[in-house]
């Protein structure tokens, strides 16, 4: 897996600009709603470039948007030339999740590139770093100087969306990197919206149990290098740190630096770092915000993050995104990361041919799986496997399983299989009282709802007592003959056939 290497976000932007994948906007544009309007239908959905707003109204700091607005740029950020190469990233993760010892000298030789990449997993700690070129603290901290965007008309307040939140639990050696949105509620205060099962929230819960009443250290990095950003959204094994995975992607060790006010380590090349703490028991109502579902979410309480220090580069760039009804930037990330999931699932379930998370299904709420079916009831086993194997699919409400003659990424094929190979009573699996996304207001209880599996495979003996239909297939000899005379027929030409 030969990777393109970027030392920092600016290296990546330079390459994007050279390839026509970055557009600089010099016209003053307001971060309040206007950037989203330029970005949404007019740029992202048209497959347009990353946007660098150099003169956001009221601010001296540029705003970077749409960085991962096409699958190609996601692949480039992971060091690959195109999306298809992301399967190799998935194979590497599958190997790291369940490494297999070499079966012999030849196998050892074949695995040497994977073992060599492991050398890039440890971080490299620096004494000084670009992200600490400027430091403000105490009363000088003012988050209002950062051009934090307001994306939708009914959003409660400006919202940080691409912050890499760094935490460490009291019993863990490695740090956790997670991306959680953060609502601005004061010059030095943000609401940290993390769900209870996410790594940062788990670290906080463990800290509260181990250190009652003590402040929980938190740091947030904005504008890290692309490998570190994407490492935070990729399904890395629980035993692998996001920094280690970023080193694998980049092909060089991730450079980190100790924070000014706590012992957490942040990406040395980040544009901006927010340092501070969460006071146990301090919460605030968060939202509403327009979300990836296409709706405003309900208001709920989350911990308050108090910022004590802001460190940054000279001439820092603020990196932002928005969420809305797909396609949005997270949906584009989902399309690309879909290719990473396939090899991970195939290692556990070799019968899986393809796996697809349609972006219109919010990128995770519906999955289509195609398999080489081997026995009666096989489809139901695969459904249960998808729901339980990776925590990324904990909130997948619908799983459709089809045979390998169906294209999982073609709705015409999938709907044909559902309507011709399913009996609703026999082939529908309903599971009640399962974990559901807090943002899913369709569930009867917040965080708890049902799941549905659809077995759209051909039925085997034991699954049906009827003679099963045989798909219509063309005669290959006739097809070859018509191919040979097709041009002579001139059916789509104005002239007459010969």
From Swiss-Prot:
SUPFAM superfamilies per UniProt: FMN-binding split barrel (SSF50475), UbiD C-terminal domain-like (SSF143968)
Active-site annotation: 291
Cofactor notes: Binds 1 prenylated FMN per subunit.
Cofactor(s) needed: prenylated FMN; Mn(2+)
GO BP terms: ubiquinone biosynthetic process
Keyword Transport: no
Binding site for Mn(2+): 176, 242
Binding of prenylated FMN, residues: 179-181, 193-195, 198-199
Keywords assigned by UniProt, alphabetized: Cell membrane, Decarboxylase, Flavoprotein, FMN, Lyase, Manganese, Membrane, Metal-binding, Ubiquinone biosynthesis
Source organism superkingdom: Bacteria
PANTHER family named among the record's database cross-references: 3-OCTAPRENYL-4-HYDROXYBENZOATE CARBOXY-LYASE-RELATED (PTHR30108), FERULIC ACID DECARBOXYLASE 1 (PTHR30108:SF17)
Subunit text: Homohexamer.
Family statement drawn from the similarity comment of this UniProt entry: Belongs to the UbiD family.
HAMAP family xref list: UbiD
Primary role: Catalyzes the decarboxylation of 3-octaprenyl-4-hydroxy benzoate to 2-octaprenylphenol, an intermediate step in ubiquinone biosynthesis.
Protein name from the UniProt record: 3-octaprenyl-4-hydroxybenzoate carboxy-lyase
UniProt organism field: Escherichia coli O6:K15:H31 (strain 536 / UPEC)
Gene responsible for this protein: ubiD
């Amino acid at each position: 897996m030969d990777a393109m290497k970027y030392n920092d976000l600016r290296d990546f932007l330079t390459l994007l600009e050279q390839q026509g994948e970055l557009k600089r906007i010099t016209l003053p544009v307001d971060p309040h709603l206007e950037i989203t309007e330029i970005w949404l239908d007019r740029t992202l959905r048209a497959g347009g470039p990353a946007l660098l707003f150099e003169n956001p109204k009221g601010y001296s700091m540029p705003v970077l948007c749409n960085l991962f607005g096409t699958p190609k740029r996601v692949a480039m950020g992971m060091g690959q030339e195109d999306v298809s190469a992301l399967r190799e990233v998935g194979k590497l993760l599958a190997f790291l999740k369940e490494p297999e010892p070499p079966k012999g000298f030849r196998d050892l030789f074949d695995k040497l590139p994977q073992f060599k990449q492991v050398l890039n997993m440890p971080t490299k700690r620096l004494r000084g770093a670009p992200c600490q070129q400027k430091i403000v603290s105490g009363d000088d901290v003012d988050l209002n100087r950062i051009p934090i965007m307001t994306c939708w008309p009914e959003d409660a307040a400006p919202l940080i969306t691409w912050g890499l939140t760094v935490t460490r639990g009291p019993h863990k050696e490695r740090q956790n990197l997670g991306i959680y949105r953060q609502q601005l509620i004061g010059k030095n205060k943000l609401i940290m919206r993390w769900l209870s099962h996410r790594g940062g929230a788990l670290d906080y819960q463990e800290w509260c149990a181990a250190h009652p009443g003590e402040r929980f250290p938190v740091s947030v990095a904005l504008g890290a290098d692309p490998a570190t950003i994407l490492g935070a959204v990729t399904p890395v094994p629980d035993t692998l740190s996001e920094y280690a995975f970023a080193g694998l992607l980049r092909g060089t060790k991730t450079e980190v630096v100790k924070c000014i006010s706590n012992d957490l380590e942040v990406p040395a090349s980040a544009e901006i770092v927010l340092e501070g703490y969460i006071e146990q028991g301090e919460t605030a109502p968060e939202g509403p915000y327009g979300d990836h579902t296409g709706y405003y979410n309900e208001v709920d309480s989350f911990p308050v993050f108090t910022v004590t220090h802001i460190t940054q580069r000279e001439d820092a760039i603020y990196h932002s995104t928005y969420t809305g009804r797909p396609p949005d930037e997270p949906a584009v990330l989902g399309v690309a990361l879909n290719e990473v999931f396939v090899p991970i699932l195939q290692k556990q379930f070799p019968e899986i041919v393809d796996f697809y998370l349609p972006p219109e299904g919010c990128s995770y709420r519906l999955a289509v799986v195609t398999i080489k079916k081997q026995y009666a009831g096989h489809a139901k086993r695969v459904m249960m496997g998808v729901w339980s194997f990776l925590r990324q699919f904990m909130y997948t409400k619908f799983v459709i399983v089809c045979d390998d003659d169906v294209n999982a990424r073609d709705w015409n094929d999938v709907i044909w299989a559902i309507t011709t190979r399913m009996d609703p009573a026999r082939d529908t699996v309903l599971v009640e009282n399962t974990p559901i996304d807090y943002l899913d207001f369709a569930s009867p209880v917040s965080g708890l709802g049902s799941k549905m599996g659809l077995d759209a495979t051909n039925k085997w003996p034991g699954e049906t007592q009827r003679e099963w239909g045989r798909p219509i297939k063309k005669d290959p000899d006739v097809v070859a003959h018509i191919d040979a005379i097709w041009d002579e027929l001139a059916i789509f030409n104005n002239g007459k056939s010969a």
